[in-house]
Amino acid sequence: MSDRIDRDVINALIAGHFADPFSVLGMHKTTAGLEVRALLPDATDVWVIEPKTGRKLAKLECLDSRGFFSGVIPRRKNFFRYQLAVVWHGQQNLIDDPYRFGPLIQEMDAWLLSEGTHLRPYETLGAHADTMDGVTGTRFSVWAPNARRVSVVGQFNYWDGRRHPMRLRKESGIWELFIPGAHNGQLYKYEMIDANGNLRLKSDPYAFEAQMRPETASLICGLPEKVVQTEERKKANQFDASISIYEVHLGSWRRHTDNNFWLSYRELADQLVPYAKWMGFTHLELLPINEHPFDGSWGYQPTGLYAPTRRFGTRDDFRYFIDAAHAAGLNVILDWVPGHFPTDDFALAEFDGTNLYEHSDPREGYHQDWNTLIYNYGRREVSNFLVGNALYWIERFGIDALRVDAVASMIYRDYSRKEGEWIPNEFGGRENLEAIEFLRNTNRILGEQVSGAVTMAEESTDFPGVSRPQDMGGLGFWYKWNLGWMHDTLDYMKLDPVYRQYHHDKLTFGILYNYTENFVLPLSHDEVVHGKKSILDRMPGDAWQKFANLRAYYGWMWAFPGKKLLFMGNEFAQGREWNHDASLDWHLLEGGDNWHHGVQRLVRDLNLTYRHHKAMHELDFDPYGFEWLVVDDKERSVLIFVRRDKEGNEIIVASNFTPVPRHDYRFGINQPGKWREILNTDSMHYHGSNAGNGGTVHSDEIASHGRQHSLSLTLPPLATIWLVREAE
């Protein structure tokens, strides 16, 4: 005789309110034999089938017209593989029963996930194609410890939450289920009854692909193969390397002219990659490409942290783009957003009816500036989700570096908050200790697991040791954006030259703290939006002076210690602010040769010259690599310094930030001899006035500026020149 199933249990199963489906469904030992139970809505007949022979072993009785079937296979005591022949609407289908498979997640994996120390949680959680007991399908697993019931719904089950309720692994709070026949390319979500009894539909936090907005389903998709970083790519990230970064928003770099639609990943591989290579950049930095619902967030409010956006193509198309960049000798940096996530119902917000990924108190868990939620870094599973994501992009896509967004908002509890709007840490301070530990741990793990890849911090305060090792009290980043340098120098450049003498320190101050961090000098997307104007439009004067100022500024920037970053459009002096809904103004480069061509040629020459001469990059973070020659000539707004490599070779950099040419300008130098002008931002090649020094100048044994030898130069108006000493 079979074990009678309580009517309340059947009702709960059919209503989708039963939390332990494996205790009822599937094959079970009873006093009468092996009993098979199945919930198959809309089925009319069900048989248990012997797979090898196709023989019908037993017919299941319909105990509830809503689809609950049960039947006993007499004289059988040991579990065996079986299939179900199910008649739906007059058609017989042979299926494998999901409830005949045992637990999916190994005990060690479950323990590591609960401890938050699983290096690669994405290998266990999410949707993974698999073969179990000879049956192909997909195993699903999702962390939702407070949900009352979780089901997988998708194209394989008519989005019906009754058909595939999952098993809860109570020790870890993870729900799991293997669904035979579910395959790559099919859409799915998790349907759950949350902690409050509400029905929710959630996309998979670990989905490797997702639908493009406005749709929100996840896609079953295989885990990408690992990508090994080559030695060349590792060297290109090092502190002594020439690093010149072209920052790009893929959706607006260039668009189709007929319909203003985006270029695909593959089209970008064919157009953007060779352009960046031709321009002499060493790295491409991509604004976030994680799936996100709102175009206007530029990707900085992601909902699919493991899924490249489908706006530009498939996951494999994105890998094609990265491969093309690597083949062209370009490293790829990905903007990464572990600081916050949007409030959209389909994603992480109140995932299982509780504040699972975020803090429950809005003073800790809500960003007022962006209407987003803040990760609870103190919850081990949450920090594991994020650390694993960093490793995922590097290992599985070949990303060479991560630029971490909005670090200051993570490490300070009072970031952009008034008194009473934030909660102090356990010691009464303003630092977010859990976020600090998360960042240190992420950088430590990346250093251990993917040596050669690096991280960069956008950190807008003077928090000490952002790019210093953890054992020295630092956060462990390799590089930090120098936002102070950027603000000071742009504030200086926007001044009418007649007033610059009173703000000379805005150009000299940066060197005083230059060696406290490993700096990147950024002219990023943030500087050409929200009414700030374009970089060109911030320059003072008439059109000629605007372009001359910009060229002089770029010459100064590429010579100053620190790695370089330039947002797209700035390389040809786009006059408008950036618009994420439109292409860059490439028409400025159409027709006859003009000032925009001149700036573009200058940036290319700056990149190539900077890369060629080790003195310009080898000792960016060593005081030996820089020395002032003229630092105090405020009245004429002239600054001169040398850059130096490890062998002592020097390059002289001289800037004149007034429109007055300075003839016979004498200054002391360290190394006498013949000096050749290798770059002049006032060259006619760049549409300047072509003032200069006729190629080479010889030093004189005339003391100046405390040095025995000196040079006498013509300093062109609103220009920067670079000189290298010729071999004897």
Swiss-Prot record:
GO terms for biological process: glycogen biosynthetic process. One of its GO terms (cellular component) is cytosol. Disulfide bonds: none annotated. Pathway: Glycan biosynthesis; glycogen biosynthesis. It is an enzyme of class 2 (transferase). Belongs to the glycosyl hydrolase 13 family. GlgB subfamily. This is 1,4-alpha-glucan branching enzyme GlgB. It comes from Shigella boydii serotype 4 (strain Sb227). The gene is glgB.
